[in-house]
Curated annotation (Swiss-Prot):
Record's keyword terms, sorted: Amidation, Antibiotic, Antimicrobial, Secreted, Signal
Main location: secreted
Prosegment residue ranges: 20-29, 54-80
Name assigned to this protein: Clavanin-A
Biological role stated in the UniProt entry: Has antimicrobial activity.
Lineage: Eukaryota, Metazoa, Chordata, Tunicata, Ascidiacea
Length: 80
């Protein structure tokens, strides 16, 4: 009787361990999928901010990339 219970217990633990491994691989796939979604959303937000953000105008003025703004700053330096 004890031997039978011991064998059933060992077999049961083996089945649980196998299902745990299968579940773990499914969870990893879900996390990888969510990671890809988060990555793409981050890229979209980053691109959106570059297209519609104010940095497109202000960076050129601050660093003097525009021909009419060379040597000037968009803020008042007080020494002009």
């Amino acid at each position: 009787m004890k031997t039978t219970i011991l064998i059933l217990l060992i077999l049961g633990l083996g089945i649980n361990a196998k299902s745990l491994e299968e579940r773990k691989s499914e969870e990893e796939k879900v996390f990888q999928f969510l990671g890809k979604i988060i990555h793409h959303v981050g890229n979209f937000v980053h691109g959106f901010s570059h297209v519609f953000g104010d940095d497109q105008q202000d960076n050129g003025k601050f660093y003097g990339h525009y021909a009419e703004d060379n040597g000037k700053h968009w803020y008042d330096t007080g020494d002009q």
